[in-house]
Curated annotation (Swiss-Prot):
Residue runs in coiled coils: none
Record's catalysed reaction(s): a tRNA precursor + 2 CTP + ATP = a tRNA with a 3' CCA end + 3 diphosphate; a tRNA with a 3' CCA end + 2 CTP + ATP = a tRNA with a 3' CCACCA end + 3 diphosphate
GO MF entries: ATP binding; CCA tRNA nucleotidyltransferase activity; magnesium ion binding; tRNA binding
Native species: Pseudomonas putida (strain ATCC 700007 / DSM 6899 / JCM 31910 / BCRC 17059 / LMG 24140 / F1)
Family as reported in the entry's similarity comment: Belongs to the tRNA nucleotidyltransferase/poly(A) polymerase family. Bacterial CCA-adding enzyme type 2 subfamily.
Residues where CTP binds: 8, 11, 91, 137, 140
Pfam families the UniProt entry points to: PolyA_pol, PolyA_pol_RNAbd
Keyword Hydrolase attached: no
Record-given protein name: CCA-adding enzyme
GO BP annotations listed: RNA repair; tRNA 3'-terminal CCA addition
Essential cofactor(s): Mg(2+)
EC number, as in UniProt: 2.7.7.72
Binding site for ATP: 8, 11, 91, 137, 140
Function of the protein: Catalyzes the addition and repair of the essential 3'-terminal CCA sequence in tRNAs without using a nucleic acid template. Adds these three nucleotides in the order of C, C, and A to the tRNA nucleotide-73, using CTP and ATP as substrates and producing inorganic pyrophosphate. tRNA 3'-terminal CCA addition is required both for tRNA processing and repair. Also involved in tRNA surveillance by mediating tandem CCA addition to generate a CCACCA at the 3' terminus of unstable tRNAs. While stable tRNAs receive only 3'-terminal CCA, unstable tRNAs are marked with CCACCA and rapidly degraded.
Amino acid sequence: MHIYKVGGAVRDRLLGRPVSDIDWLVVGATVEEMLAKGYRPVGADFPVFLHPKTGEEYALARTERKSGRGYGGFTFHASPDVTLEEDLIRRDLTINAMAEDEAGTVYDPYQGKQDLDKRLLRHVSPAFAEDPLRVLRVARFAARYAPLGFRVADETLALMRQISASGELQALTAERSWKEIERALMEVQPQVFFKVLSACGALQELLPELDDSSRTLAALEQAAVHEQPLHVRWACLLRGLSPTSIKAVNQRLKAPRECQELAMLTGECLAQGNQALELPATALLELLQKFDVYRRPQRFEDFLVVCEMAARGDGEQGYPQADYLRRAAAAARAVDVKPLVQAGLTGQALGEALKGERLKALEAYQRG
């Protein structure tokens, strides 16, 4: 039995980057031997075990064969006679197909170290084209390592185009696609992910509503620079689409509720946000009501951040509308409902009276 660190842990150590998760590969062992040593089985499709003390994942060396469409269309074979090289060749990129033994010796049968030095994302074997999820994974790695100067190798991009043209991307579930998009959105340069998808034809397959123009991606780029959370980045990406298109994208990818809500509200209200300084008090109140700023102030704040990121992406140096709207929201929230309740108002009458008082507060705010 031989145990190796594999994949990202080896890659990131060689790049001098922090190593978070470690994947372990076991060569020359049987399921029975792993169980006898106290490892706990967790793999549904192939033998993966949890270490009895650390809880880290240890997988038996395996080969795989294409047996159907999509990400899950593979048959796996794990046995003690599967070699290290046979296991590594099934991996996506050469930089992910390196292993390191307990003595620190790196095994690199497919020139991953050479590609690290060349800053190349290159596939290991032609079998790369059998897994459509790899198109998204490579684009995500391109986004992650763009600051280090990495690019997708021409021959790998050609295979990605082949996958996109084959229709195999349609076999990906919404959950798998969203998981990769979500991870890509949180990379340092998420706009690179969408540029790579566009370059290989995958963007048109997965997100035909989008393009890779600088304006489309500029707000997202700004959101990443300012380290904004996922739902803000998602809304920034979709900010140029119509509400109808935003709804279609959200439903197709089954985006999380928080992402869906902010993206939809942005699509519906971005124009009003940009015109805030000219809005009459009635329109201002309607905007605040739409966001329910009285009970959900953070959602409105997130919207203002999206507006600001979009303005920065469009080349604006500042966005005074944001502070103007924050002060307007504070003025509306400051209205005290108690006197109205004490006056005996209830139900719809109370709601209308409260709305009227908030309108007066906004008019007073606008008068200065």
